[in-house]
Amino acid sequence: MKRILLILFLTLFSCEKEFDDGFRVFTIDKGKHRSGTYSQHKINDNAITFQVVLDESAIYDFSTPFSPTPQDQHDINKIYGFSDFGQLHQESSIRLGWSYFSYDKGPHKAGELWFRWLRHAWGQHRGGPLMKIEPNEIYTVTIRKWITQYEFIINDSIFIVDRDIEQNRMLDWMDSYYLYPYFGGQQKAPHDITIKIKDLPVDRTNRGKKREKLH
């Protein structure tokens, strides 16, 4: 059943356009989760490097009195990443995501837009903060997998997330594949959301100035 669902997921068309500057513009339509579904695009390296731009459409507010689930405000929306350990991404994957904070929560202040990480391991997901960002800015990102760690390099900062090598014991039956923009969490997009992504050659310089260990 999982194999059938994967084929359906990877063979339909996508809501994306490519422009002369090399950026692909992915659109998540209002009331949808996905920016589209995609032909299988294999990862042929241990890393991907890309540039990404979020604009004001990445800002949303589920904390109004009319929202029955204001906690959904802090769900991690997905931008880009890849599956891992030869498994479906719901079993094992790593992704860059984002959240908009419409009210203060922990270290996050109302009105802040943040990059966040999202990891699936053993079918369970977990995520956390990376860095505060600004709309309409270009960020260069590398996501790399090492034996026991995932590494996010965002401009001049490096962040480390644990990677459970024990997942190698799982049946490895498929290549790693790219994961594309998706809104949610539980909520669907409250309005049209556009995300610009440009694939780059994998960055092997590893020149980050700041390294932070996450989970």
Language-model segments: residues:
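Sec-dependent signal peptide recognition
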Residues: 1-7
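Short tryptophan-centered beta-strand motifs in secreted/extracellular beta-sheet-rich domains
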Residues: 50, 137-145, 150-154
